[in-house]
Regions:
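Glycine/serine-rich phosphate-binding loop and adjoining beta1-alpha1 elements at the start
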Residues: 1-18, 54
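Conserved N-terminal Rossmann-fold NAD(P)-binding element of oxidoreductases
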Residues: 24-29
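Hydrophobic/small residue at the entry helix of a nucleotide-binding pocket
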Residues: 31-34
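NAD(P)-binding Rossmann-fold cofactor-contacting core
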Residues: 44-65
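Rossmann-fold cofactor-recognition segment
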Residues: 67-80
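N-terminal glycine-rich "phosphate-gripper" loop used for MgATP/nucleotide binding
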Residues: 78, 98-106
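Conserved Rossmann-fold cofactor-binding substructure of NAD(P)-dependent oxidoreductases
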Residues: 78-91
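Rossmann-fold NAD(P)-binding glycine/threonine-rich loop
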Residues: 107-115, 123-160
Length: 174
Protein backbone atom coordinates (compact mmCIF):
# COMPACT_ATOMS: atom_id res chain seq x y z
CA UNK A 1 0.00 0.00 0.00
CA UNK A 2 1.42 3.38 -0.98
CA UNK A 3 1.46 6.19 1.56
CA UNK A 4 0.61 9.62 0.29
CA UNK A 5 1.44 12.98 1.83
CA UNK A 6 -2.21 13.46 2.82
CA UNK A 7 -1.83 10.53 5.24
CA UNK A 8 0.51 12.68 7.31
CA UNK A 9 -2.09 15.46 7.62
CA UNK A 10 -4.53 13.44 9.73
CA UNK A 11 -6.45 15.25 12.41
CA UNK A 12 -6.59 12.22 14.70
CA UNK A 13 -3.71 9.92 15.43
CA UNK A 14 -3.59 6.64 17.26
CA UNK A 15 -2.49 7.04 20.87
CA UNK A 16 -0.10 4.32 22.00
CA UNK A 17 0.41 5.18 25.66
CA UNK A 18 -0.58 7.56 28.40
CA UNK A 19 2.04 9.54 30.29
CA UNK A 20 0.93 11.42 33.39
CA UNK A 21 4.29 12.96 34.19
CA UNK A 22 6.13 15.88 32.68
CA UNK A 23 8.39 15.74 29.63
CA UNK A 24 11.33 18.09 29.17
CA UNK A 25 12.78 18.24 25.67
CA UNK A 26 16.23 19.81 25.82
CA UNK A 27 17.17 21.20 22.42
CA UNK A 28 14.91 22.27 19.58
CA UNK A 29 17.13 21.52 16.61
CA UNK A 30 16.19 18.87 14.06
CA UNK A 31 15.64 16.07 16.60
CA UNK A 32 13.70 18.23 19.06
CA UNK A 33 11.53 19.59 16.26
CA UNK A 34 10.82 16.06 15.03
CA UNK A 35 10.08 14.46 18.40
CA UNK A 36 7.62 17.06 19.72
CA UNK A 37 4.87 16.30 17.16
CA UNK A 38 5.34 12.57 17.74
CA UNK A 39 4.79 13.07 21.47
CA UNK A 40 1.73 15.23 20.95
CA UNK A 41 0.22 12.91 18.35
CA UNK A 42 0.86 9.54 19.90
CA UNK A 43 0.87 10.00 23.68
CA UNK A 44 -2.05 10.81 25.88
CA UNK A 45 -0.46 13.72 27.73
CA UNK A 46 -1.51 17.17 28.80
CA UNK A 47 0.52 19.49 26.51
CA UNK A 48 1.00 21.80 29.50
CA UNK A 49 3.22 19.06 30.93
CA UNK A 50 5.61 19.29 27.98
CA UNK A 51 8.40 21.87 27.98
CA UNK A 52 10.93 22.62 25.27
CA UNK A 53 14.13 24.11 26.68
CA UNK A 54 16.84 25.36 24.35
CA UNK A 55 19.85 27.61 24.18
CA UNK A 56 19.34 28.77 20.61
CA UNK A 57 16.39 30.86 19.57
CA UNK A 58 13.88 28.89 17.53
CA UNK A 59 10.95 30.60 19.26
CA UNK A 60 9.41 31.92 16.02
CA UNK A 61 9.49 28.44 14.50
CA UNK A 62 8.10 26.93 17.71
CA UNK A 63 5.23 29.45 17.76
CA UNK A 64 4.50 28.88 14.07
CA UNK A 65 4.18 25.14 14.64
CA UNK A 66 2.79 24.89 18.16
CA UNK A 67 1.05 28.16 19.10
CA UNK A 68 -1.96 27.46 21.26
CA UNK A 69 -0.96 23.85 21.88
CA UNK A 70 -0.19 24.43 25.55
CA UNK A 71 3.42 23.25 25.22
CA UNK A 72 5.86 25.48 27.11
CA UNK A 73 8.90 27.03 25.42
CA UNK A 74 11.88 28.25 27.45
CA UNK A 75 15.10 29.76 26.15
CA UNK A 76 17.89 29.12 28.65
CA UNK A 77 21.46 27.96 28.33
CA UNK A 78 22.26 24.91 30.43
CA UNK A 79 25.75 25.12 31.95
CA UNK A 80 27.80 23.16 34.48
CA UNK A 81 26.89 25.72 37.13
CA UNK A 82 23.13 25.89 36.53
CA UNK A 83 21.99 22.55 35.09
CA UNK A 84 20.71 21.08 38.36
CA UNK A 85 18.65 24.14 39.21
CA UNK A 86 17.34 24.75 35.69
CA UNK A 87 16.39 21.15 34.94
CA UNK A 88 14.88 20.77 38.41
CA UNK A 89 12.42 23.55 37.57
CA UNK A 90 10.74 21.38 34.95
CA UNK A 91 11.02 17.72 35.98
CA UNK A 92 11.05 15.60 39.12
CA UNK A 93 10.66 11.96 40.09
CA UNK A 94 8.75 9.94 37.50
CA UNK A 95 9.17 12.51 34.74
CA UNK A 96 11.11 12.20 31.47
CA UNK A 97 13.92 14.17 29.85
CA UNK A 98 14.59 13.86 26.13
CA UNK A 99 18.02 15.38 25.61
CA UNK A 100 18.42 16.34 21.96
CA UNK A 101 20.97 19.07 22.58
CA UNK A 102 24.66 19.64 22.12
CA UNK A 103 27.29 20.45 24.72
CA UNK A 104 25.50 19.21 27.84
CA UNK A 105 27.63 16.64 29.63
CA UNK A 106 25.89 13.26 29.37
CA UNK A 107 27.44 11.89 32.57
CA UNK A 108 26.37 14.91 34.63
CA UNK A 109 22.83 14.75 33.28
CA UNK A 110 22.57 10.97 33.75
CA UNK A 111 23.77 11.23 37.34
CA UNK A 112 21.26 14.01 38.06
CA UNK A 113 18.47 11.91 36.57
CA UNK A 114 19.52 8.82 38.53
CA UNK A 115 19.64 10.80 41.78
CA UNK A 116 16.22 12.36 41.15
CA UNK A 117 14.26 9.41 39.74
CA UNK A 118 13.89 11.03 36.32
CA UNK A 119 13.93 8.90 33.17
CA UNK A 120 16.12 10.09 30.33
CA UNK A 121 16.63 9.43 26.63
CA UNK A 122 19.78 11.01 25.22
CA UNK A 123 20.71 11.28 21.55
CA UNK A 124 24.46 11.26 22.12
CA UNK A 125 27.26 11.33 24.67
CA UNK A 126 28.29 14.95 24.83
CA UNK A 127 30.71 16.84 27.04
CA UNK A 128 30.33 20.35 28.39
CA UNK A 129 31.12 22.93 25.73
CA UNK A 130 34.18 24.20 27.63
CA UNK A 131 35.61 20.65 27.71
CA UNK A 132 35.82 19.57 24.04
CA UNK A 133 37.71 16.47 22.94
CA UNK A 134 40.76 18.56 22.06
CA UNK A 135 41.30 19.36 25.75
CA UNK A 136 41.70 15.67 26.64
CA UNK A 137 45.41 14.83 26.31
CA UNK A 138 45.17 11.06 25.81
CA UNK A 139 43.64 10.18 22.43
CA UNK A 140 42.16 6.92 23.74
CA UNK A 141 40.21 8.90 26.34
CA UNK A 142 38.45 10.85 23.57
CA UNK A 143 36.78 7.79 22.07
CA UNK A 144 33.15 6.77 22.44
CA UNK A 145 34.38 3.42 23.72
CA UNK A 146 36.11 5.13 26.63
CA UNK A 147 33.15 7.44 27.25
CA UNK A 148 30.74 4.48 27.34
CA UNK A 149 33.00 2.85 29.93
CA UNK A 150 32.98 6.00 32.07
CA UNK A 151 29.17 6.16 31.85
CA UNK A 152 28.76 2.46 32.73
CA UNK A 153 31.07 2.81 35.73
CA UNK A 154 29.23 5.91 36.96
CA UNK A 155 25.84 4.22 36.61
CA UNK A 156 26.95 1.28 38.78
CA UNK A 157 26.42 3.69 41.69
CA UNK A 158 22.69 3.74 40.83
CA UNK A 159 21.59 0.10 40.36
CA UNK A 160 17.88 0.83 40.92
CA UNK A 161 17.56 4.18 39.18
CA UNK A 162 14.96 5.22 36.62
CA UNK A 163 15.47 4.06 33.03
CA UNK A 164 18.22 5.92 31.20
CA UNK A 165 18.93 5.39 27.49
CA UNK A 166 21.93 6.98 25.76
CA UNK A 167 23.13 7.15 22.15
CA UNK A 168 19.89 5.69 20.84
CA UNK A 169 20.63 6.76 17.29
CA UNK A 170 18.51 9.87 16.73
CA UNK A 171 21.55 12.12 16.50
CA UNK A 172 21.74 13.46 12.94
CA UNK A 173 25.32 14.66 13.33
CA UNK A 174 26.62 17.53 11.26
Amino acid sequence: MAISFKDFKKEKYEKYAEFNGKILIIGYGSVGQAILPVILRHLVIDPKNVTVLERDNHRALFIKRHAGSGVNYVREEITPSNYKKEIGKYVSEGDLIINASLNIDAKSLLEWCAENGVMEIDTSLERWEHNPDETIPKLADRTLYHTHGVIRAAMEEYPNCATLCVTHGANPGY
